[in-house]
């Protein structure tokens, strides 16, 4: 029986430690090269978070080309029957973005380690400095559009009653007081709930337990299509992950995010 079949999308350190030797597991570390070298969860393979992005201005958060993803997932030993567990050390931004990429490649079996390395260390669980054996060369992938909202898609949906735009940036960015593009402000109709507000620092950066109710208060509800973004779809990786974990049926990441929207001459903006 699949060791992971009974688990929810968001799992706890004890769940992972009990399954570290599962043959189907691909454990992905999205911390930093220095942090990984210092010690990582046993068996984890390091992925430089920047490899999950296109990396080209003005919208570095756009999806990398298929060839780059095929190389990346080949290095991880990707196979359809695999179960991914993903973690970072910042509360879930990079890990959530990686989960978005798993949706893009059509991988349906994955989990997020709640609180990531922070929660693992808080429980004094084991670390390793060993490097996993190389997994192989590039794999053939089919990419799916459904997890992603393009700029044109979002422009066509603005004002729809069944749309909620979740802006994961800071309130200062949302209000146009801190400007990181040609234009400041936010996408018309967007609701601001900063990604860090979804974390519980008293519980080692785990997702706060009252998050469903908080989103309900903001009108970010399961009956709507959720499109979430930040500046580069890094911070909004966490908010994408949270909506998925809550079972929201229609969730998209706007990969271009404010880097694209705020630098495009024809996009509407609210302050």
Swiss-Prot record:
Name of the protein this chain belongs to: Thiosulfate sulfurtransferase
Organism of this sequence: Azotobacter vinelandii
Active site: residue positions: 230
Domain remarks: Contains two rhodanese domains with different primary structures but with near identical secondary structure conformations suggesting a common evolutionary origin. Only the C-terminal rhodanese domain contains the catalytic cysteine residue.
Binding site for substrate: 235
GO molecular function, one term: thiosulfate-cyanide sulfurtransferase activity
Catalysed reactions listed for this entry: thiosulfate + hydrogen cyanide = thiocyanate + sulfite + 2 H(+)
GO cellular component, one term: cytoplasm
EC number: 2.8.1.1
Keywords for this protein: Cytoplasm, Repeat, Transferase
Gene3D superfamilies the UniProt entry points to: Rhodanese-like domain (3.40.250.10)
UniProt keyword Transferase present: yes
Domain of life: Bacteria
Domain annotation Rhodanese: ranges: 21-129, 159-270
